[in-house]
Amino acid sequence: EQDYHQFFDEWSDRDLSASVRRDRNHPSIIMWSIGNEVAQRADEPEGDLISKRLVGTIRKYDTSRFTTIGSNDFWDRRQFTWDKDSYRIFRNLDVAGYNYIWWKYESDHAAYPDRVIYGSESYPKEAAQNWNLVEKHPYVIGDFVWTAIDYLGEAGLAHALYLGEGEHNPQFMGWPWYNGWCGDIDLCGDKKPQSYYRDVLWRERPLTMAVHAPVPDNKKEVVNGWGWPNELVSWNWKGLEGQTLSVNVYSRSPKVRLYLNGKLIGEKETGKENYTATFEVPYE
């Protein structure tokens, strides 16, 4: 009953004006967004009218920043297709935010060569695909992952479960799950494995390693869309002595060697697709 859409027509201009006037002198502001995953984004004429009105409100108080929107594919508007209808989303805006559709960057650039694109939401598991395109193309200016830090709600959105044949993989999880678990950083402020992986992508560190927890017999790991495999940046697996564990080595180096207590386990290529080499190692 209190959803903001009930007050949007009356309050959106006033609230947006207040936000821009409050924050326009902060150097951290690089763009103003008029929304994220907006249902009416390509509707005619409603989407066009709303977009023009909000952009006009922003430019009334700040002409120095770009305007943008975060847009998902048309899973919620089945009568539309991205190739045919997405131009209406961005025609009043300076920069186009793409949610989870990095695979459209290059083809959309061919269709709209003046469009400036960034990833406004992306999956942790697809970090390499997104960042490779950022570095490859000047028209792709960056990538925002969903999310930087964990948050309360959407409980278990980023789960990784061990499931048997025919077992259901839910979108969300019940108690004791209470946060989304998709953050690169947890609620205590500690880095999670995907954050160390992203450090490698960003060239902040040359290499990082993580050990995958054992998968029970007759089970397989199912990682939800926003999830990350159940691995830890830890070498302490007391009680698993002699058991073989998977070790992921993340590096931009073309090849890596893994040693266990001074003994060479093997040498593998990492690959430019995901910069990962996986070794099977007996725990000592």
Model-derived regions: residue spans:
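N-terminal catalytic cores of secreted or lumenal carbohydrate-active enzymes
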Residues: 1-27, 52, 60, 91
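Active-site cleft segment of glycoside hydrolase catalytic domains centered on the general acid/base Glu
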Residues: 3-6, 35-62, 83
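Acidic-and-aromatic substrate-binding clefts and catalytic sites of carbohydrate-active enzymes
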Residues: 5-10, 40-43, 76, 123-128
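Short gly/ser/thr-rich secondary-structure transition/capping motifs
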Residues: 13, 76-81, 98
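Substrate-binding clefts and catalytic carboxylate motifs of secreted carbohydrate-active enzymes
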Residues: 28-32, 49-74, 88-284
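Short acidic, glycine/serine/threonine-rich loops at helix termini
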Residues: 43-44, 79-80, 154-158
